[in-house]
Regions:
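Walker A/P-loop
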Residues: 247-269
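Accessory nucleic-acid engagement/destabilization modules that flank
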Residues: 1-216
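SF2 helicase catalytic motif II
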Residues: 342-346, 356-394, 399
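Conserved Walker A/P-loop ATP-binding site and its immediately adjacent core
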Residues: 270, 278-301, 314, 408
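C-terminal helicase lobe and adjacent C-terminal extensions/tails of nucleic-acid helicase motors
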Residues: 42, 392, 459-468, 474, ...
Length: 705
């Protein structure tokens, strides 16, 4: 029996209003949310769905949607200041009917438009949940009318075992929130824009994509030239396929740079996902420059339609070709293969906003490949490791820690056996005898400075570098790259984040072309080339840094092992030391290598990286600088959490005193900027302009005014 209350309104081709009935909307959202939360709390998601819009039964809301708006399209769904509050009523009803357990639903329902709230006073805008629940007016008005009994029925909900552990509570609530929000968006979209809704979910299965991948790998194997490096890569691939037979859990893939991690990890992910009945593969990569490269590799294999690239710097030319389906998939990650940034992935796992949280339920029952794990931000390492433990333990997520320099992520005990640093335990290493593998892939000699306390001048280095026709120099600071580049011979390339992404992409393509044709090419770059950018130089210079950075720099030298002798990597002390985390990393690197001053090393053994990361982490005052874990631990058994404050404080990249500058780099940028001036900051436009932005610190920006 339909009660005649309206949830949303759309208009037909004649401008006549068509109603989306509230009873139908609540039941359909409940059903869909329960499906999304099948692994971790279907009954909770169902109840949240059926109560989320109880406030729309309020006669004031019905009058608003029927009369005040005149059925205006743009006002039919979005709740903003000045509109009738329709989310507090359902939250209050949950607490009234279920007591303390109802608070969990209250977080979801109260936040389903504005985002998950804090229990107590918030840092950001919006009312804290505790205060909102004290106001019973919204509930009284909504329940004063006749509502179907099945919608008001209160089930007997008991939190699952995982949610009874305090450290698991916040992620569980966020996962439920994701299921509710995505279900609400999709059901509304199904009514408001059926054509858009029907474009979703039309993907090939992972089973089919595995067949496509296997055909591609067979072709590569047939055409591969015989070499020791290719033999080693084939063995790495074999071991990845064997490890894929193991149960869901945590894995590490410790392979030296140039060992073919990208394709081997995809082989593992596909085989494992198909065997375990998983729904998607998510690649998490630290830098957008690597994402573009990796996503292109996967698109070539699987086709554009099956790979979704989700980050800010999408190429505008590709964006023109981007279909509606891939744009929609970035909203909730329902595609089979997702390639995204560490920032997007981890900030979503700690988010409060609906747009960020919406995708979370689709991380469950997936394979997540975390590329370049050594770049996990140490200031947030504790909360990141906690959420990683939970994903594998409770949400059927297999995580692969893929890097040439595995960080020290195991739980550390003090001399008395007490936990000193929580970490990841029971991690299965995919590659057997990885130390032997590192020795087999030794392709460089590492020359250390005679004295780690004495710096070299840029002038001295520039003069020395002129002797090489093909050389890459990597420094840690953008200003260092500028200073050295200014002293280098004409034609030397510069790469840093002071260039917009479009400019960097063009320069990288030009460098790669010259490397292939054996032309003279000198490059001065910041560390943005260290992780995953496929360049191969005979000589690489690296300013003193952490051991992981030195190893990554070495990965740009004699990458394919084609030199008659080994490549040459020179570590030098720059004129000015780095500050902050980079400075502490360099200090830890010096303390590890100081006893070897003046020596030439054949390799950096894997165990040295474990010791280095232990020392580096111990140098830091805290591995949870923002206190995220404390904010997300319920104060008591009542579930008092500070979701919004934690989301605001969890920032992989500190905003600080920074400014975004648009660069009129080419004709495309000029056109986009002209459109910006005439139209203002439309979302689609700002997305395209991302590739033409540079972030400046205040001290760099203010002199430009």
């Amino acid at each position: 029996m339909r009660s005649g209350f309206i949830a949303h309104v759309r208009f037909d081709e004649n401008g006549e209003p068509i109603e989306h009935w509230l009873d139908d909307h609540l039941r359909d959202v409940a059903k869909l949310a329960a499906e999304f939360a099948d692994l971790f709390g279907a009954d909770w998601a169902h109840t949240a769905g059926i109560w989320h819009d109880l406030g729309k039964y309020n006669p004031e809301f019905q009058a608003y949607i029927r009369h005040k708006t005149g059925y205006e399209r743009e006002n039919a769904h979005i709740e903003t200041a000045g509109r009738v509050d329709h989310s507090t009523a359902g939250a209050s009803y949950a607490v009234e009917k279920l007591g303390v357990a109802g608070r969990i639903l209250a977080y979801l329902i109260a936040g389903h438009h504005a985002g998950l709230p804090d229990w107590h006073q918030e840092l950001g805008s919006g009312g804290a949940l505790k205060k909102r629940l004290e106001n019973k007016t919204h509930l009284q008005k909504a329940t004063a009318v006749s509502i179907p009994a099945d919608i008001l029925a209160a089930p007997n909900l008991q939190p699952p075992a995982l949610a009874r552990q305090a450290e698991n509570f916040a992620l569980w609530v966020r996962m439920l929130f994701s299921a509710l929000v995505d279900a609400d968006f999709l059901d509304t979209e199904r009514f408001m824009s059926e054509a858009k809704f029907n474009q979703r979910g039309q993907y090939q299965s992972l089973t089919h994509l595995r067949e496509v991948f296997n055909d591609h790998m067979n072709t590569l194997a047939i055409n591969a030239k015989p070499s020791q490096v290719n033999e080693i890569r084939a063995d790495i691939l074999r071991q990845c396929r064997e490890a894929a037979e193991k149960p869901v859990g945590l894995f590490s893939l410790s392979v030296p740079t140039g060992g073919g991690k990208t394709l081997s990890s995809m082989a593992f992910a596909l085989d494992h996902a198909v065997k375990q009945g998983m729904q998607r593969i998510i690649y998490v990569i630290p830098y957008t420059s690597i994402i573009e490269q990796t996503a292109q590799v996967f698109r070539t294999i699987f086709g554009d339609e099956n790979v979704v690239e989700h980050h800010s710097n999408t190429d505008p030319d590709k964006a023109e070709k981007e279909n509606a389906q891939s744009r929609l998939a970035t909203e909730n990650w329902d595609a089979p293969i997702i390639v995204t940034t560490s920032v997007q992935y981890f900030e979503s796992l700690f988010a409060a906003r609906t747009s960020r949280c919406r995708k979370l339920h689709n991380i469950a029952n997936s394979v997540v490949v975390l590329d370049e794990t050594q770049l996990l931000p140490p200031e947030h390492l504790k909360p990141i490791l906690r959420v990683m433990r939970q994903l594998s333990a409770h949400y059927r997520v297999t995580q692969v820690l893929s890097t040439a320099t595995q960080p020290a992520l195991k739980t550390q005990l003090d001399p008395f056996g007490r936990v000193e640093r929580e970490g990841l335990d029971d991690v299965c290493e995919i590659i057997s005898a990885s130390e032997t593998l590192y020795q087999q892939l030794e392709r460089v000699r590492l020359e250390l400075p005679d004295d780690f306390q004495t710096s070299r001048s840029w002038e001295e280095l520039a003069e020395e570098l002129e002797d090489y026709e093909r050389v890459l120099v990597i420094v840690s600071r953008r200003q260092d790259a500028r200073d050295l580049h200014a002293l280098m011979p004409k034609g030397t390339y510069h790469l840093s984040a002071l260039m917009c992404a479009q400019h960097r992409s063009q320069v990288i393509d030009e460098i790669k072309r010259k490397l292939k044709t054996d032309e003279s090419v000198r490059v001065v770059s910041t560390q943005l080339v260290e992780a995953g950018v496929d360049m191969d130089f005979p000589v690489v210079y690296r300013a003193m840094a952490g051991l992981d950075s030195i190893a990554q720099a070495a990965g740009r030298c004699n990458r394919e092992g084609l030199l008659s002798d080994k490549g040459k990597v020179v570590v030098f002390i720059p004129p000015k030391p780095s500050r902050g985390l980079l400075g502490k990393a360099a200090e830890s690197g010096v303390s590890m290598l100081a006893a070897l001053a003046g020596q030439t090393l054949e390799s950096l053994p894997p165990q040295m990286f474990t010791q280095y990361f232990d020392q580096f982490y111990n140098k830091l005052n805290t591995l949870d600088k923002a206190g995220i874990n404390e904010l997300l631990m319920p104060d008591n058994q009542l579930g008092d959490c500070q979701f919004r404050t934690a989301a605001l404080k969890f920032r992989m990249i500190e905003d600080g005193d920074t400014y975004t500058v648009f660069v009129k780099f080419d004709e495309k940028a000029a056109e986009l900027l002209a459109t910006l001036e005439s139209m203002g900051p439309e979302r689609w436009l700002m997305r395209k302009l991302q590739r033409y932005t540079v972030t400046l610190y205040g001290y760099q920006f203010r002199p430009l005014l």
